[in-house]
Amino acid sequence: VELRTTDLVIRPPVPDDAPEAFVLMNDPDVRRWNPTRACPDLATAEQWCRSGADWSDGSHASWHAVDPGTGRMVGNVSLFAIDRDDLVGKIGYRVLPAARGRGVARQMVDAVTRWAFESHGLMRVQLEHAVPNLASCRVALAAGFLLEGTARSAYAVPGGGREDCHLHGRLPGD
């Protein structure tokens, strides 16, 4: 499934995205808010791209946003924890340092959320972030997600720490 916005092509990951994926997965700002392991080499980044493209179990769907002018990856967005019974899912994203401040995150989140409602039949998409991650709060609000509350100590951060978590939600009619 390929999605388009004014400035982006949002498509499934491909192994050729590995160099950008490697930079993304090792970026200090991404690592600060994502309790995932570091990416030690390009082969691991390539495998990450391959696994992101496998949507066969129906629990997630991942895309890479690319600049249509260069064809280079600028970000990653995933719809995950998809519950087909309750028709809800969660969305998360990351943006390469060189692409920050250009609306990439907002466009990715909005496009994938619309797809989740229109093509996947979901009735709710949630976006969660650590409260100190102000940039993610701005992205959520700009993409039409309402701030619904704060869950105490609910967000794991690297190093075994915990942060309070903002819960944002978006419904098809929002």
Language-model features: locations:
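Conserved GNAT-fold acetyl-CoA-binding loop/helix
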Residues: 29-51, 63
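Short loop/turn motifs at secondary-structure junctions and domain boundaries
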Residues: 53-59
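A short hydrophobic/aromatic micro-motif that marks alpha-helical segments and, especially, helix-coil
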Residues: 13, 32, 41-43, 56, ...
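Short, P/G- and charge-enriched loop/turn segments at secondary-structure junctions
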Residues: 50-53, 154-156
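Acyl-donor (CoA/ACP) binding surface of acyl/acetyltransferases
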Residues: 1-28, 62-174
